[in-house]
Structures are given as C-alpha cells and as structure tokens.
Amino acid sequence: MQAVTLQADVRSPEACQKLVEDTAAAFGRIDVLVNNAGITADKLLLRMTEADFDNVLATNLKGAFFCTKAACRFMMHQRYGRIISVSSVVGLHGNAGQANYAASKAGLIGLTKSAAKEYAARNITANVVAPGFIATDMTAVLSEPARAAAEAAIPAGKIGHAEDVAAAVAFLAGEQAGYITGQVLCVDGGMGM
C-alpha cells in the first residue's frame, strides 16, 4: 500500500480540490479518502460564539464535504473507492460543552451515509469510524481528574490509542470491507453502550 501526506486548509474548496488533484497526480488514481481533519472550541452553548460554532463546522464538516466531492469525481471514473470519515461518539450522543463539535460530527455521519447511498452502485463504499476517548493532542489538554473520570466511564477500563482508530480505518479501506457501506464503527472501548 502506498500513501502520501499532503497538507491543506480544508475550509477552502479550492484547497481541497488541489489536494485531491495533487494526490491523483502522484499515484494516477484515488483509492481511499480519509476525512480526518478536526478541531474543537469547547464552551457551554450559552457562551459559544457564532465564530466558535462556524469555525468548528467549517473544518470538521465542510472540509469533509469538499474533500469527498473532489475525490468522488476520480472514484466514479475508476468505479472504485473507499471513503472513511472520522467522526466521534460525541456525534452520536452529544456532550456538554461541545455543541459545535457534536453538530459537526453528527453532520459528518449524515454526509457519509448519504455518500454511501449515492455511490454504492459505483463500487464506492463510505463508512464512519467514531472514536471514543483516544489519547491524542486534543485530549491531552484535559486535567488529570477529568481524564480519570473519562477512563472510569469506559467499560474496557482504559483509554484508546491512535493505533486503535487506525486499525479500524485500515480495515474499512481494505478489500475485506468491500460489502460494508453506510456504517458507523465505534472504536470506544464500549463507552457508547
């Protein structure tokens, strides 16, 4: 398997188009798209500004829309593709202080399920990985008591790692998942049960 890592401001449709075109130029095709850009701007709903809301949705949801739209053009011509969007259990259940993040991640699930229905006949699958509490830079800012409380709420009794999420993404990108589309795979240690 070959991969390339490119950087772009996913809030820009032009940047997303260039990102996809540059990837296609490097490999001659686009087989897998992973929508993984994500930011937070956590505040209680009453304190959240419109800018807080818009910035999170622009990156987390509109960025995935722009990238998916650009990549699907290549995938449709190939009659093959795998789209994997990284959402969150927060997109399924909500979370206090994260209305913008929850809305963006719930929207990402809807976007991906719609793409699954639109492109299944072209041998393009679209699925969601919804991580729970994962040790990342985004969760590293939490206080130790908050981290301990989160860990205690996970039936598996531990916090997940990036490798756990990567394994789910790799599975959905592979041939073994060719008949799986429109699904949400929670990688959360049982947190969402």
Can you say where each PLM-predicted feature lies in the sequence?
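C-terminal helical subdomain
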Residues: V128, E151-Q176, I180, V187-G189
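The beta1-alpha1 cofactor-binding region of Rossmann-like NAD(H)/NADP(H)-dependent oxidoreductases
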Residues: A8-L19, E50, E163-D164
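Alpha-helical segment proximal to the catalytic Tyr-Lys
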Residues: R73, K117-A121, G178
